[in-house]
Amino acid sequence: MNGSGENVAGCASCAGRCCREYRVAVTVADVRTLAAGTDLHPREFLTLRPVDSTRNGFRTRPRGPAHELNLVRRPANGGCVFLMEIAPGKARCGAYAHRPLVCRSYPTFLRAGAVAVRPDVKCGPGSWSLAAMDLPGYRRDLVHSQAAWTEHWKIVTAWNAALDAAAPDAAPADLYEFLLTGAMPR
């Protein structure tokens, strides 16, 4: 949901279905924003999820399997680590001001350059109306998200190349430190 405050209708009766049913893949920029904004270390909110061998992702072994960065899911409710139950059937993001770009732009995507509502939206029918939404705000967030993912893939490539050149395995803690500082492990 866009942060403008003008688009809360879709989330007003939120039960957190999107935060429970989607895996939330995040960028390096998202990790840094969440860490700085919540004062949490990435090990407290990230998990490395293995991805198909044809996809690019962070590796912890030279030429090893790739992983994407996902927000941790709580075993108790299956939801995102930041999902807060505020009342029965009502949930909100506990890191709202620092939430990932994919969450910020939900439930929209760009179709031929125009903002559109995802066809697989988890909210109830009629929750989102383009006529009532801050379309310039969503467009800005979507364009920003595309740029962040472009930068993310450059960082993934740099990490993997450095790992391949150095030859030792890297622990997840090394990767998390790299995400925060940009410094490769020694």
Predicted regions, residues:
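Short loop/turn segments that flank or connect secondary-structure elements
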Residues: 1-186
